Each structure stands twice: as structure tokens, then as C-alpha cells.
Amino acid sequence: MIKWPWKAQEITQNEDWPWNDALAIPLLVNLTAQEQARLIALAERFLQQKRLVALQGFELDSLKSARIALIFCLPILELGIEWLDGFHEVLIYPAPFVVDDEWEDDIGLVHSQRVVQSGQSWQQGPIILNWLDIQDSFDASGFNLIIHEVAHKLDMRNGDRASGIPFIPLRDVAGWEHDLHAAMNNIQDEIDLVGESAASIDAYAATDPAECFAVLSEYFFSAPELFAPRFPALWQRFCQFYRQDPSQRLRVNAAEGDYGEESEH
């Protein structure tokens, strides 16, 4: 279990969050003005309902807190803040942290070792993050620690543990499971061919259905151009679940940029 530090900094309520500055990251650039306004409203409620707790000397400020809240709320922009029920604290280390991990092997032996983690989430516990990886979540690279952990929370709303199948209509479960496993197999095939470091999708997605859902949720929001054309059927299922289409946002933003360039000639 994690040993909580004796001293921690907790963010206090602040009515003057720097939302304009907080929105100025590549991850959020394709949102419309209306979507940005709704995301801010959700983020304000998030900061009212959750405690952000800085650990081991890390210091939170208004800008950091606002950006964290915006990214937390991006996956539930069309779902509603109630989808983030079930936890009250976000614990933030300055860097990846060490935990004591236990697991049971195929013959029932329990093993224990200390491992380095970037983040953790439990069904009825806090979400644990680290600032170094949060900073790397601001861009549009396919990596996003916050979205990864939020996806696990959304996944766990469908049962006691993350399974890779979020809370969707029962009629859609078999198709979702089929398409998710097909994606895992495809990712594993690429890993076998080129190696983990050269794979175009994070190799962690091939390890487990729950991790595949969480990793592909990262790509869904931050690198749709790598997800949508490769797994079109699963992409549509993600669009239906999240009720968003980041690929469409990307196309609209690109078209508006092209139009602006033509108008200048």
C-alpha cells in the first residue's frame, strides 16, 4: 500500500481560475467555443467536488489545478459530471512513485515487489497521478495519464473491476468485446513485427482489455488520427460511448485553418 506523506498541500477553493490560460494547450485547441464553455463549467464543478492534494513537496497553483480539472472533464464532456462520482481526492506526486505490488500467479502463489507507477485508480478510492506525466498530457501525442485513469474509473462503473467494457447497452457488449480484442491482436501483431518501442500505438494496450480501453481512450482524445483509420469499427463505438468525435473536430479545425490561409492571399 502507498505510504502517505505527513505533509501534503491541498488546493483551496478559488473563484478566479485562469481558464483562458488553462485552455491554451494542444489537447484542447480543437474544441469549439461552446465546448470550451461547457468544459469550463464542468471543471468548476469538478474543483468544487474533488480535493487536489499535492504530495512530497509538489506545489499546486491555480493554473495547474485548472488544467488538471479540464483534462479530467474532457472525457465526460457529453456524459455529465456524475460519471466522475465514486472518488473525492486526486493525489499528485511530483514524479512517478513507488508502490508495493502484490499478485497471484497461475498456481496460487502470491508475489510481492516494489514497482514504479505513473498513476493508479480504484473503484472506491482516489486517483493518484504524477506531475511529470501530467505535463506530458497537455500535447496531442497519444499519451495522456489523466484520461487513462479517468477511463479506468468509467470502466469500473460497469462492475467491481475494470474489464475494458464500460457502461454501455447490453446489446452492444458482444460487438464491443469483439472489436476491442481485434484491436489488441492487431497491436500485438505490430509489436511482434517491429518491437514495442517502434509500435505506433502504446504496447500497453495489448496487455489487457481494461488497459486497451484506457490506452485507446488516450488516443481517442489526443491522437484521433492514429486511432480512427486503423480501428474504424471500434472508433465508432468509442464515439457512441463518449458522445464525441475528436476526429471530426480535427477535420473542422484543419479546414478552417486552410480557409484562413486562402483568405489571406
From Swiss-Prot:
Transmembrane segment boundaries: none
UniProt-listed InterPro entries: MetalloPept_cat_dom_sf, MtfA_enterob, MtfA_fam, MtfA_N
Biological process terms in GO annotation: proteolysis
GO terms assigned for molecular function: aminopeptidase activity; metallopeptidase activity; zinc ion binding
Cofactor binding: number and manner: Binds 1 zinc ion per subunit.
Enzyme class: hydrolase
This enzyme's EC code(s): 3.4.11.-
NCBIfam families: PRK15410.1
Family: Belongs to the MtfA family.
PANTHER family given in the database record: MTFA PEPTIDASE (PTHR30164), PROTEIN MTFA (PTHR30164:SF2)
Known role: Involved in the modulation of the activity of the glucose-phosphotransferase system (glucose-PTS). Interacts with the transcriptional repressor Mlc, preventing its interaction with DNA and leading to the modulation of expression of genes regulated by Mlc, including ptsG, which encodes the PTS system glucose-specific EIICB component.
Protein's name according to its UniProt entry: Mlc titration factor A
Gene name per UniProt: mtfA
